[in-house]
Amino acid sequence: MDCDICHRSHDAKRLPFLCTVDARAALYDGRIENVMALIENEDLQKQISDLLDETNAPTKDRKDALQAQQRTAEDRTTQILAAADKLRNDIKAAKEEIQTRRAALSRRKSDIAAVSDGLIERRVKRQKSVERETGMHKYRWTKCADELARTRSFLCIEAAQLYGLKRIKEGSPSKYEYYLGGIPVVDLTAMNSSTPEMISTSLSHICQILILVSHYLSIRLPAAITLPHRDYPRPTIFNLSASYRPGDPVFPSQASVSSPSSTTDTESQRVSRPRPLFIDKPLSQLAKEDPATFSYFIEGVTLLAYNIAWACNTQGVSIGDKALFEDMSNMGRNLYNLLINHQSAGKDPDTLKNEADGQTSRFGQYSHGTTFYHLGGAEGTEFSKTFKLPSPMKLADKLKKKLLSEAPTPDWEVLDDDAWKVEEELADGSQVNKNLLMGDKSSPRRGTSGWMRVKNR
């Protein structure tokens, strides 16, 4: 309430008494409390007076009600006392548990303090011990890998010598001829001048030694090679997409005799058909008479050269310029460098860079058969990215164009006996007319018989 004299609201703590209104306002709460106490006192006096004024004895119902109230009060008091006792016991147990935990925590702190003394030194010592053991294991693994690489190198050299792989210098100082099994290694760019028997035999020898070497080196060639076996006595090779697929492959002889009912998926069989590594006819004649077989054969020999180049790169053997078709298709030189001359073969700049970084890629290290230097691991994958070979299909197209452009054009065309029937009939008819005009009674002469004629240019 506002003061009528000073016109301000009353605040008992912050504002002092300046007038009677402020004093009255300060006493207002106390007066209210006094009035309430007086009213309560009057009520109690009235109750006492009523009890004293009762002259009659209490009735039975009144006694029963009072006894019931007494029993209720006693029961409630008992419950309250039991709850109080239970609460005291809980408090006592909690205090004991707190004391036990404090004692355990104190012991743990003392133990931690005792253990923490010299913890850093022990940790450093343990770390050095683990690093030393790890280094020893790595050294042993590296030593075993080096011994395995030397063993692989020895096996490859021995296999090459047993197969008769050698290099013979030709007329020019930089030209070499490579022999395997006593016959020259086929030159892909000069197959037009080679006989079918020599080409097939040379490719068969290359397949056999390449499979043996891949077994020694524990590497999986990109294009799967199938050696002669019971179902098919000729070597074949699969393209990159169809290699190492589950299921039985369809060889050319099996595809020719298979019935349409047994062929469930023609497209899958076409994809999984192996490429032949043999020919029965001269290459120029095969290209003219059977272009499909010619294309399959060119693709097969290109895949074989691709396998050799890929094996050289995985073993750190240089093949020259990977972009040049001549370096990729030179199977004799690449095979000789891989098996015999791999220790002294020239290294490409990527290999020299790896050696400068301390990561040498020596012969026989990387393979698919060991976890150390595994070609499928992270380190092997990074190593595989250092060399990038051109696609075998592009190489096959280049080889096909080169062979077709260099195919010899014959000056003589071989004809069978049926081709001369028309000319003989024409010659006989002209001779009969001539005899009739001349009146010659002798038997007519037949035309000159032969088996070839000059081809018109």
Curated annotation (Swiss-Prot):
InterPro entries from the UniProt entry: UV_resistance/autophagy_Atg14 (IPR018791)
Keyword Ribosomal protein in annotation: no
Entry's Gene Ontology BP terms: autophagy; protein transport; SNARE complex assembly
Phenotype reported upon loss of the gene: Significantly decreases the radial growth of colonies under nutrient-rich conditions. Strongly reduces conidiation. Causes only mild infection in point-inoculated spikelets of flowering wheat heads and impairs the spreading to nearby spikelets.
Residue ranges that the Swiss-Prot or TrEMBL entry lists as coiled coil: 31-109
Biased composition (Low complexity): 253-266
Keyword terms of this UniProt record: Autophagy, Coiled coil, Membrane, Protein transport, Transport, Vacuole
Region entry Disordered, spans: 54-73, 252-274, 433-457
Domain of life: Eukaryota
Classification via Pfam families: ATG14 (PF10186)
Assigned GO CC terms: endosome; lytic vacuole; phagophore assembly site membrane; protein-containing complex; vacuolar membrane
Location(s), subcellular: Preautophagosomal structure membrane; Vacuole membrane
One example GO MF annotation: SNARE binding
Membrane topology, record value: Peripheral membrane protein
Family label: Belongs to the ATG14 family.
Record's function text: Required for cytoplasm to vacuole transport (Cvt) and autophagy as a part of the autophagy-specific VPS34 PI3-kinase complex I. This complex is essential to recruit the ATG8-phosphatidylinositol conjugate and the ATG12-ATG5 conjugate to the pre-autophagosomal structure. ATG14 mediates the specific binding of the VPS34 PI3-kinase complex I to the preautophagosomal structure (PAS). Autophagy is required for proper vegetative growth, asexual/sexual reproduction, and full virulence. Autophagy is particularly involved in the biosynthesis of deoxynivalenol (DON), an important virulence determinant.
Domain commentary: Coiled-Coils at the N-terminal half are essential for autophagy.
Subunit field text: Component of the autophagy-specific VPS34 PI3-kinase complex I.
This protein's name: Autophagy-related protein 14
